[in-house]
Design a protein with these regions (language model features):
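Register position in tetratricopeptide repeats
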Residues: 1, 35, 39-42, 79-80, ...
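TPR-repeat structural position
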Residues: 5, 39, 49, 88, ...
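Canonical positions in the second alpha-helix
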Residues: 14-15, 58-59, 95-98, 129-130, ...
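Short coil turns that delineate tetratricopeptide repeat
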Residues: 20, 64, 100-103, 135, ...
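Helix-start (N-cap) detector for alpha-helical repeat units in TPR-like alpha-solenoids
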Residues: 23-24, 67-68, 103-106, 138-139, ...
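Terminal, low-structured helical/coil segments at or just beyond the last alpha-helical repeat
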Residues: 86-89, 97-117, 181-224
Length: 224
């Protein structure tokens, strides 16, 4: 796996050198470095993470309206420690930029900020507002369902997942995140296994959780 991620970063590094004004290429390079950081040792992961941040920042500099790049940089700032260039103040500033481009995404970003600060009531309000603004976007429902599950409100979470599955019956993301929620909560494990098996038979995109992650989750659901 590490070899695959190295090939990806090497190829994308060449791509940005040939197309230095491409915001999207820098975005993809940042994602590749991020995946490489996740799979790396504790000694090399910080270096890879820093390269991911630099690529995301460059992508946003090149195109201030590249919402995917802004979102990825927001997530980096939200989750990374300060010594790696993260920080809630930086994330909050980016959330305001997101608001200028997409109101639903803005409320999702605000929800994550409040959740990070353990202000769960405010976070829920923003998650629900994001759903109201984009009722046909299945991702907004998944976000709300995952949040509710994390709060221990499993029945409410399952009802929202059911709503998402009716909206997009064959969505791989719904299958995966619903199954993962069941496994994390230790409930409906038989159903989780069926969902994961369907997921593994689906046509996945690079934006979907990896097959390896789904297989690992399936083994966990079976007690392995």
């Amino acid at each position: 796996m590490l070899a695959d991620f190295k090939k990806a970063t090497d190829a994308l590094q060449k791509a940005v050198e040939m197309n230095p004004s491409s915001s999207d290429y820098y975005l993809w390079l940042g994602r590749a470095w991020g995946r490489r950081a996740e799979a790396a040792s504790p000694f090399t992961a910080p270096l890879h993470a820093a390269k991911a941040r630099q690529a995301f920042e460059r992508a946003v500099q090149l195109d201030g309206r590249n919402l995917e790049a802004i979102n990825d940089l927001f997530d980096y700032y939200l989750e990374a420690p300060g010594f790696l260039g993260g920080g809630l103040d930086k994330a909050a500033a980016l959330a305001e930029r997101i608001g200028q481009l997409n109101p639903a995404e803005y409320h999702y970003a605000e929800a994550k900020l409040f959740d990070k600060r353990n202000e769960h009531s405010a976070a829920e309000q923003h998650f629900r507002r994001a759903v109201q603004l984009a009722p046909r976007q299945v991702g907004r429902l998944i976000d709300l369902a995952r949040f509710l599950a994390k709060q221990g409100r499993v029945q409410e979470s399952d009802a929202v997942f059911e709503q998402a599955q009716k909206l997009a019956p064959d969505s791989p993301k719904v299958l995966f995140w619903r199954a993962k929620t069941y496994v994390q909560e230790g409930q409906n494990l038989d159903k989780a296994q069926k969902l994961l098996k369907r997921y593994l038979q689906s046509d996945l995109t690079p934006d979907d959780p990896s097959r390896q992650e789904a297989e690992k989750l399936l083994r966990k659901s079976m007690g392995a």
